[in-house]
């Protein structure tokens, strides 16, 4: 579950299946990765995934104003079956694209930045 207010596909391939962004699919031969970019209504960013066989949840929470580049990366292949729930300060499209979109951030010399991400396993 990702309680975002906006979901955008990374590319045309992901756009073809955007209505299923929230579903885990069975492993599929020839599956091509799909990435979806999420925006949250406020600073309360979070995502959670449930594994019914283990009756276990993984929950992450973060400041979505600071880490404003949340990516859901899906690779539902037969051998490569992965879900990435990645909060970051940009999207994985390269600095040129982030600069164009106004998302490229800089640190001044000697400046540092601290982010907090909370990860919980709920059994």
Predicted feature descriptions by range:
Residues 1-59:
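Active-site/ligand-binding surface loops and adjacent short beta/alpha elements
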Residues 48-123:
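Active-site pocket scaffolds in enzymes
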């Amino acid at each position: 579950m990702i309680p975002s207010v906006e979901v955008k596909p990374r590319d045309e391939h992901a756009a073809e299946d955007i209505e299923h962004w929230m579903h885990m699919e069975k492993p599929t031969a020839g599956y091509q990765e799909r990435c979806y970019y999420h925006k949250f209504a406020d600073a309360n960013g979070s995502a959670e995934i449930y594994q019914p066989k283990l009756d276990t949840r993984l929950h992450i929470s973060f400041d979505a104003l600071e880490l404003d580049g949340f990516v859901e990366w899906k690779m539902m292949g037969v051998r490569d079956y992965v879900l990435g729930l990645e909060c970051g300060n940009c999207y994985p499209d390269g600095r040129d694209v982030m600069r164009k979109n106004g998302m490229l951030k800089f640190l001044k010399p000697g400046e540092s930045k601290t982010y907090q991400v909370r990860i919980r396993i709920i059994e």
